[in-house]
Each structure stands twice: as structure tokens, then as C-alpha cells.
Regions:
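Short hinge/gating elements
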Residues: 44-46, 91-98
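Conserved catalytic-core segment of NTP-binding enzymes
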Residues: 1-77
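Beta-strand-loop-alpha "switch" segments that mediate conformational coupling across diverse proteins
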Residues: 68-95, 108
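Residue-level recognition of oxygen-bearing side chains
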Residues: 23, 84, 103
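A general structural signal for short secondary-structure boundary/capping elements
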Residues: 33-37, 56-58, 86-93, 110, ...
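NTP-binding/hydrolysis catalytic cores, primarily Walker-type P-loop NTPases
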Residues: 94-145
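Phosphate/oxyanion-binding loops and surfaces in catalytic or ligand/nucleic-acid-binding neighborhoods
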Residues: 64, 68, 82, 114, ...
Length: 145
């Protein structure tokens, strides 16, 4: 995590998940090797019931990070909880391949597109999340699983 120019923290509305996410960020911000200017930290709210709940998850984490760590995090978006996502998890397959028209699969596409768009303006992040998502979408579009 310290070597990455981007960190994507995936959390859920459950209190234990928020606590774990904050603990990770706390250890990151307090590490002397962590470079705040070089690292972009984003939060993805996963398995939420609404866009408002997703934003609320981010707001809670952002408040404590700002107040106690004097840090900055951005909102990467949200992935809704739906039956297709639950089924894909049980089958151990990506929901974007298992049920590409589901709400959660579409949300993953929106989040990936926004992360890629944000990276195009940040040239120094050329080995960050855009590279990861570019490879995934290329494989998906070519039909490779």
C-alpha cells in the first residue's frame, strides 16, 4: 500500500468494516514512509442499499480521517447490494461477467469509468488503478474470462 500512488479502500456500512477501514488508514497515515502528496486515497462503499447510504458511509469515514488524521480521502462511488451480486459472490465469479446487466455490475462499470477518467488527468499515476481496470475491461470486451 505504501508504494502505490493510489489506494482504493472498499468498505461496507457495517460498523466492523468501517472500523477496519479506519484502522488501515490510520496505520497508513501514521507510517513515516507514507507520502500524502503522492498517494490518492479513495473510498468505495460496497453492498449498500442506496446511493445515500453509500455517500453516508464515505462521509463517516471522511469525517474521522479529516478530524483525527488530518487526511484527505475522495469518494469513488458505491456498489449496491443486489441478488446478482450475492449470487456471484457465492459462485466466486465477477458479477460483471455473471450478470452484466445487474445494478451492481453497472455500478462497477460506472466506478471503473470514473476512476479511469480521473487518472487521465493525473499522468504520474499511469501505473495505478487505470492500468488494472483497463486490463479487466479489455479482457471482458474480448470475451476472455
Amino acid at each position: 500500500v505504501l508504494a502505490s500512488p493510489e489506494v482504493l479502500v472498499v468498505t461496507t456500512p457495517e460498523p466492523t468494516s468501517l472500523t477496519d477501514s479506519y484502522s488501515l488508514l490510520k496505520s497508513l497515515y501514521r507510517n513515516p514512509k507514507f507520502n500524502r502528496e503522492y498517494t490518492k486515497i479513495s473510498v468505495l462503499s460496497n453492498r449498500v442499499t442506496s446511493a445515500a447510504e453509500g455517500r453516508g458511509v464515505y462521509d463517516k469515514l471522511n469525517t474521522v480521517v479529516g478530524q483525527f488524521l488530518e487526511g484527505e480521502i475522495t469518494y469513488a462511488g458505491m456498489i449496491p447490494r443486489d441478488s446478482a451480486l450475492e449470487k456471484a459472490i457465492r459462485m466466486q465469479k465477477p458479477v460483471s461477467l455473471q450478470a452484466p446487466l445487474s445494478k451492481s455490475a453497472r455500478a462497477f462499470e460506472v466506478v471503473a469509468a470514473e476512476l479511469l477518467q480521473g487518472e487521465s488527468s493525473d499522468a504520474y499515476r499511469s501505473f495505478g488503478l487505470s492500468r488494472l481496470f483497463s486490463g479487466f475491461w479489455k479482457q471482458k470486451n474480448e470475451g476472455v474470462e
